[in-house]
Amino acid sequence: HEHHAHRGPKEIAAIFDASAMTTGAKETAHRILDILTDAEAKAHGVARDQVHFHEVGAVDSIVDIAAFAICFDALCRTYAVNDCIVKEITEGCGTIRCQHGILPIPVPAVVNIAAAGGLRLHMTQVAGELVTPTGAAIAAAVKTKDQLPASCQIEAVGLGAGKRVYETAGFLRVFLLDD
């Protein structure tokens, strides 16, 4: 059983503020953190300043948020990205064991983020959590549209995969489009 540091949003925000990230990357990291904080506060029925992250507060999740923010900021500056289209997010089913016990999938924080951020969840029969609260918060933080253009040119493709193994391929595919 691993023990992760329990940090509040102010401590995590201070880590981002003290970093060498660009202003744009810091703004993105703060947006992601704010979305996570709101979702966790609602899930636990507490005020924002009473939220203490368990999994999210772990160093690896802070690094995930910062790394995404840095890469997204660089992408936006390099390619003059105007919009981020998030059509839907694919989620699994069943339950997951976490710091708070056994929770249904999607976990309450993901449900809260999807509802508040206008994210469409495509529910599948894949047993397991395909969308983490951090992943949902990232999508909600950068989403500006939810529909692809009728026609467009694909300029580049990016693929990413997690560590978990499921019965179906689980990866994120991102397109850089020019319409």
Model feature map: region roles:
Residues H1-H44, V107-V110, A114-A136, P149-I154:
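Glycine-rich nucleotide/cofactor/substrate-binding loop typically near the N-terminus or early
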